[in-house]
Amino acid sequence: MYAVEVRDHIMIAHSLKGAVFGPAQGLHGATYVVDVAFFRAELDPDNIVVDIGRATDTLKQVLHALNYANLDDHLAFMGQVTTTEFLCRHIFDQMAAAVRDGRLGPHAGGIDRLRVTLNESHIAKAWYEAAIA
């Protein structure tokens, strides 16, 4: 399996409702380093996994709607607990749609799976990984 990973970052604010979250129940900020890995069994006709420029630009566009936002006020997340894991899936869905829609290039349809990792710090990260349906 071949893979290429691109990286960006976002800064958000949110609160996590529920006793399980302890002090994170209050409004707080987070800076995430966001990695998106693209996997495919065989290279495309240009001998690449994905166009890195398009992948980087698309990730930047996906993250733009979240960057510097208070997720408690974000319409797409009303009623949701915006955990790191939840945000991984949200970004995954947006990136998978970009693959399916051809925004990552004419041969991106050969991408088999994606993994979206949100690095909270040097000691904690979460990810969502799945096949592209």
Where are the regions that the model predicts?
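Charge-rich, low-complexity N-terminal segments
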Residues: M1-A133
